[in-house]
Amino acid sequence: MEQKTMSIELREKNGKGVARKLRAQDVVPGVVYGKGIEPVSVKVAAKDLAATIAGEGGLNSLITLSGGGSLNGNIVIVADMQRNPLKGDILHVDFHRISLDEKVKVHVPLVMVGTAAGVKEGGMLDVVTYSLDVECLPTAIPEAINVDVTNLAIGHSIHVSELVLPAGIKVLNDPETPIVSIHGKAKEEAPAAE
């Protein structure tokens, strides 16, 4: 996975009033925490954060911090992000400092690939699970896990245990968790004309 770089600054003051003032200046308040460090309050330009988590890697992007005193050069991933429910603006972000040689737990989106045979027969595709919790080395985090639904027939499902996963990826979800199924009746053939 591609590593990205993002500039941050240390934040000396905390609280709702300070956070509101930062957001009014298009700056997102945040915190960096992780193994071996005390949580550190930071701030990042909203446009820089949005650009960093857009595209390849998304929220699971490996981010090298630039600036921020002792945080300079640290590698983080987005652990949590709060958004304004109406506007979608990022209100706060939590960064988790990681080591490239220690496994991390992340959410990885699932992407349905192909047109299911059951859909062609008149059934309806029902996606039940949209992401999986996985554990892997940071450099092995997949952008997404593809689920091939091409051979899925009416009345059948694909479960977590049936997925073909990239090497080094351990799924933390229950293996019997359904991911996608096909419901409905097959198209009836038109009766022959007499």
From Swiss-Prot:
Chain segments annotated as transmembrane: none
Keywords in alphabetical order: Ribonucleoprotein, Ribosomal protein, RNA-binding, rRNA-binding
GO biological process entries: translation
GO cellular component entries: cytosolic large ribosomal subunit
Main function: This is one of the proteins that binds to the 5S RNA in the ribosome where it forms part of the central protuberance.
Organism the protein comes from: Geobacter sulfurreducens (strain ATCC 51573 / DSM 12127 / PCA)
Superkingdom of origin organism: Bacteria
GO molecular function annotation: 5S rRNA binding; structural constituent of ribosome
Protein name: Large ribosomal subunit protein bL25
Family, similarity comment: Belongs to the bacterial ribosomal protein bL25 family. CTC subfamily.
Assembly, per entry: Part of the 50S ribosomal subunit; part of the 5S rRNA/L5/L18/L25 subcomplex. Contacts the 5S rRNA. Binds to the 5S rRNA independently of L5 and L18.
